[in-house]
């Protein structure tokens, strides 16, 4: 049953009536800590004898979290509710979440203690301003928490309880006046969900990863601006302890969701990808609890504000250095407590415009990036662990679409993985969480893990390359094969390397095959992350006679790097590397070096600066 009070409430009280605002209607937050007159807000008192500790408190539930409306002729209850919830807080949703609070205090050794408990409220107003004067005001009180007044007394002493029975509403904390002008051309409606479309800037931090879907954990402790997530404020008097406790029950909290493309990145699709990446417990599956306890010192009062918080996740579609689509998912977390000296109720009230809608992060900053397999792409399995030398024929039935091949190796070691004619290029990932989970007669145990960690590989379909990677027999791996023509017979070729070419792990080796002319040759490839490697294999044009040579120089552009030039040789144990030269500064390097015609070299680059999505490698051949 609604307990809303509908009565005209004009400017009869001692309210702020002169404002420095333009003509129009405004929604205003007047602050927390309001005690109401003429309402049954007194919850009762508690008496403790000398030396005893008393505890008083209350559990605010939906049935007791009743807002009080004071509409006017122009501003009815619906108008008040919609505008307040649009700007400041969804108090209808907040009332679904139970919240408890309590106070405790010990009586002195020579006196008894009387503690009297009251509800407190957050006050909102809708005002009409004309010529800097408030000509009409509607008021809404939304339940906050409570306040306890402690009085020490001697036996048979009369207690002055006038404090509790006030003739007008009053704020025991500092009043506020946070305002926003109401645009009457916009019809404000209460949102029944938190889905919003967002625009975003694609010029964000470059990710050193291939194209695909990524889920990013951006950390915990997010709160909405304008105190939209405020649970309530306790005024705790000196020598008193106060606490706020919230049991977070199933289905009483809802995520906040924004998307740039509701057709592709819907909330349901985003939640499925978050579950793929982090196996998170979504909002309707968990029951949690948090509690904050604070004690005021003997010489001053304090206030304790408690907020609901969120953990932020992002789902992005990353393509060629840009974010094509993005969704933001704010998962209800627990809470945050802010403690400060109690403000003076006599402090001046300052007119303050609302902050821009958004989020602030108060918790630890995170940027944990996990790739997820696009559900539109096929997954094939090599069910038996691959031996040291193995060839896998890619089924023709899947060659018209990109696909993943799930596998594990029989022996831990460094492997060269390539395709027939070194095309198309490959990308290899580790299946996150696949290590030491289970054993199935040494066969592949598919735990249906869709979370992947990028190791190395390239996006470009025209980039001849192969992979040198360290693989462990207790882990599962995915190789992504880009779309290839069904008329092309393609194979995955695995070989465990015993030579020191293993020094190149974990990197992609790009094959350069157009060095027949003199001049500058650019090779733009996706840049790995800082501290990781990318390699280039080149065979010097001409016949090998161990005498004739050509002059080259090697450099990077945009990205700083450290380089090592190797001569590649082959022996009975496999491929070996002979170090020819080391480069400590590759950015715009012009140092020449003489290389044997007909010989094969590998130039390995360690990225030390990520300035561009691509690394530009320049092999310059002198005439």
Swiss-Prot record:
Misc remark: This protein can also be encoded on a prophage.
UniProt-listed InterPro entries: Clenterotox (IPR003897), HA70_C (IPR040597)
Protein name in the entry: Hemagglutinin components HA-70 type C
Subunit structure comment from the entry: Botulinum toxins are produced as progenitor toxins of large molecular sizes of 12S (M toxin) and 16S (L toxin). M toxin consists of a non-toxic, non-hemagglutinin component (NTNHA) and the neurotoxin. L toxin consists of the M toxin and the 3 subcomponents of hemagglutinin (HA). HA is composed of subcomponents of 70, 33, and 17 kDa. The 70 kDa subcomponent undergoes proteolytic processing and is split into HA-53 (also called HA3b) and HA-22-23 (collectively called HA3a). Upon crystallization this cleaved component forms a three-lobed trimer of dimers with a hole in the center.
Propeptide: 1-6
GO biological process: symbiont-mediated migration across host transepithelium
Record region (HA-55 domain 2): 373-496
Consequence when changing residue 460 to A: About 25% mucin binding
Entry GO CC: extracellular region
Domain commentary: The HA-22-23 chain and the N-terminus of the HA-55 chain are structurally similar, as are the domain 2 and domain 3 of HA-55.
Job of this protein: The hemagglutinin (HA) component of the progenitor toxin protects the structural integrity of botulinum neurotoxin; may increase internalization of the neurotoxin into the bloodstream of the host. The HA component is involved in binding to the upper small intestine through interactions with glycolipids and glycoproteins containing sialic acid moieties. Whole protein and the HA-53 chain (but not the HA-22-23 chain) bind to bovine mucin; if the mucin is pretreated with neuraminidase (removes the terminal sialic acid of glycoconjugates) mucin binding is decreased.
Annotated compartments: Secreted
Region called HA-55 domain 1, residue ranges: 204-372
Positions of region (HA-22-23 domain 1): 7-184
Source superkingdom: Viruses
Keywords assigned: Hemagglutinin, Secreted, Virulence
CDD domains tied to this protein: PFM_CPE-like (cd20227)
Stretches the record annotates as Sugar binding: 460-462, 513-514, 522-525
Region feature HA-55 domain 3, mapped onto this chain: 497-623
